[in-house]
Design a protein with these regions (language model features):
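Terminal-proximal segments
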Residues: 1-72, 82
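Active-site helix-to-loop segments that bind/position phosphate- or nucleotide-bearing substrates
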Residues: 1-20, 29, 35, 89-251
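A surface-exposed, charged beta-strand/loop segment in the N-terminal or early-internal portion
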Residues: 40, 48-121
Length: 251
């Protein structure tokens, strides 16, 4: 089993990143602020204007450490990673499977089963921790709706039908999202899921986190030789990592 490592987030503008021996170092204004052992890191995320030394990029490329560049406000600019490996025959088989309806349906069903199961577990965990009876019952009702939605998936004959089941389940889940945030220290609240643009702090955080996860999934796919754009649940669209978005659904 692969060991899960850390992500180094660099938030200070005008930082300078370089490597020394087996350490990833961050310097600000000529003063070294931190040195992190590379063996504990599998990705670096840089916010805003900063400089990354060429030797560090070479160092990261050889060790499979991805470097993501975002604007100060969190918009994705680009990502660096080392040589793409993987079996070309795997990618060939992936393309062939796009034209196999039974394979596509089974894969999408598995993805959505996992999504509904994980969403249900989140609701049940919140129900166990709340002290309010009304909230507890509402969260349990939401979990039951997700169970019923999952039970409907095997009877869906098309991927479009499964998308409809997933959409209804997502509505039930997000209708209870604010209940899981009660009494949070920051005072955040959630009304409804909004995108492009997200219209409040919680939606902005959700979209930002999804973006980071999508890039991580995309990088992992390319590393093993899969095409992140060749998706099954999300339709094919130029410039969109549809397959990475498919797997993101489970999270």
């Amino acid at each position: 089993m692969k060991k899960l490592l850390n992500t180094l987030y660099v938030l200070t503008p005008e930082s300078y990143l370089f490597c020394r021996n087996e350490n990833i170092c961050v310097q600000v204004g000529g003063t070294e602020k931190v040195a992190v052992p590379a063996l504990t890191v599998d990705s670096i995320v840089c916010f805003g204007k900063m400089t990354v030394s060429t030797p560090l990029l070479e160092f990261c490329g050889k060790r499979g450490i991805g470097v993501t560049f975002l604007t100060q406000s969190g918009h994705f600019m680009g990502r660096f990673y080392g040589p793409v490996s993987g079996n070309v025959l795997l990618r060939k088989r992936q393309y062939e499977s796009l034209n196999e309806p039974a394979f596509s349906r089974n894969l999408v069903q598995s993805i959505l089963f996992a999504k509904l199961r994980n969403s249900k577990l989140v609701l049940l965990r919140a129900a166990r921790t709340t002290k309010d009876d009304s909230t507890h019952n509402d969260l349990l009702a939401g979990a039951e709706l997700l169970t019923q939605s999952a039970a409907r998936l095997p009877s869906c004959e098309t991927i479009d039908a499964m998308r409809g089941v997933e959409g209804s389940a997502a509505t039930a889940y997000f209708a209870r999202f604010d209940l899981m945030m009660q009494n949070n220290p920051a005072g955040f609240c959630f009304t409804t899921r909004t995108r492009r643009p997200p219209r409040d702090e919680v939606n902005a955080l959700l979209s930002f986190t999804y973006m980071l996860l999508t890039r991580e999934i995309q990088s992992a796919m390319e590393t093993v030789g899969l095409d992140p754009a060749a998706g099954y649940l999300h339709t094919l669209r130029p410039g969109r990592p549809s397959f990475a978005l498919d797997l993101l659904e489970e999270l």
